[in-house]
């Protein structure tokens, strides 16, 4: 019995660690595409941009993290001054929570896809952020 209680306690500890680096946060979602702004061909670090990549503030969302939207997952590989200073959230947010939201700039392969997605989804949404620690623990 004592061993069972110890095993259950140990499992609970592992489960808590598994979810320790998963968080949900309110984000202002913007879009960019090839040829628009700095998204010509590569991210700031030389990574070739593809669909399912996004730009984030690395101080708030580490590079390599997965940002989970209601319809897709993106990997944080890029950054930019408007993302870091949260210009889109500060100018469009009506409530304090919206003005303080992180900005996630989602990359699309074409302008048409980006604008279609932006028109059919809200400007602010709750996204889940999975850091690499969560991914490694899950494998």
Regions found by a protein language model. Give the residues of each.
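Positively charged n-region of N-terminal signal peptides that target proteins for export
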Residues: 1-7
């Amino acid at each position: 019995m004592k061993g069972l209680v110890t095993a259950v306690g140990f499992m609970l500890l592992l489960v808590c660690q598994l979810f320790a680096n998963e968080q949900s946060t309110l984000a202002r979602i913007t879009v960019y595409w090839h040829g628009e702004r700095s998204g010509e061909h590569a991210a700031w670090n030389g990574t070739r941009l593809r669909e399912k990549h996004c730009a984030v503030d690395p101080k708030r969302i580490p590079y390599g993290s997965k940002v989970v939207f209601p319809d897709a997952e993106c990997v944080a590989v890029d950054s930019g001054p408007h993302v870091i200073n949260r210009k889109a959230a500060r100018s469009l947010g009506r409530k304090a929570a919206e003005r303080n939201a992180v900005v996630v700039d989602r990359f699309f392969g074409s302008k048409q896809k980006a604008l279609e997605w932006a028109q059919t989804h809200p400007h602010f949404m709750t996204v889940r952020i999975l850091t690499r620690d969560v991914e490694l623990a899950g494998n």
